[in-house]
Amino acid sequence: MRSISRVVDVSINTVTKLLVEAGEACANLHDAQVQDVKASKIQCDEIWSFVGTKQKNVATAKGEPEGDVWTWTAIDADTKLIVSPFVGDRSGQSAIALMDDLRDRLANRVQLTTDGHKAYLEAVEGAFGGDVDYAQLIKMYGPTPTPAGRYSPAECTGIKKVRVEGDPDRKHVSTSYVERQNLTMRMSMRRFTRLTNAFSKKVDNHMHALSLYFAFYTFTRIHKTLKVSPAKAAGITDHLWSMEEIAEMIEARQAKPMSAGLISSG
């Protein structure tokens, strides 16, 4: 944000204020538009980042850093629509928040795939009961010769598909699309780069930046395979949104009371 303030010669406080207003407007856009989603296959995953400092340094850091922060997403495998996002820790409570929100946004029964994170089990049961075809894709990892301190994951040596509830179709038990979206998110926002000094300093601003990204990804970005935006593919909008429309929406909200927004920390 400081680079933007230097380029356009305005105060960093002005840029920060715009980020907050944009985040709140985009959060409300998602909340209002992404409802009664007709989907057949949903994939869920969570991606790591940090705010202030990494978790191992929180105890000795100055100020009140948040430490590790996880962004959970549920994506429609067919339209690539991000149905539900949530920002929090990696606990069961965050999984419950994601699944409860996902349930409320769906119009029909779906096939659901997650990774093997145990927090999903109780969360899916609590949100959907038996009204879901749910499976976990569990990856198995082998030893790696890479020394300690590496930033790449261990080598995946195999996968196991485990039915949890209902009758999931094994050939559609996958997390490939949500993992690819995680990569797009990490490459689109420098806050998410692993080795960076551009990490978020406040969790609220972290969430506002994510809300802006989700609005761009969902409503204004043409997916290369779909040839339309995910929102258009899902039938929740009838046109490709422009950034000018997003900006006008921000201006229209400036005089109105702010809502709780799209995503919240656990």
Predicted regions and their residues:
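Residue-level recognition of single "structural anchor" positions
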Residues: 1-266
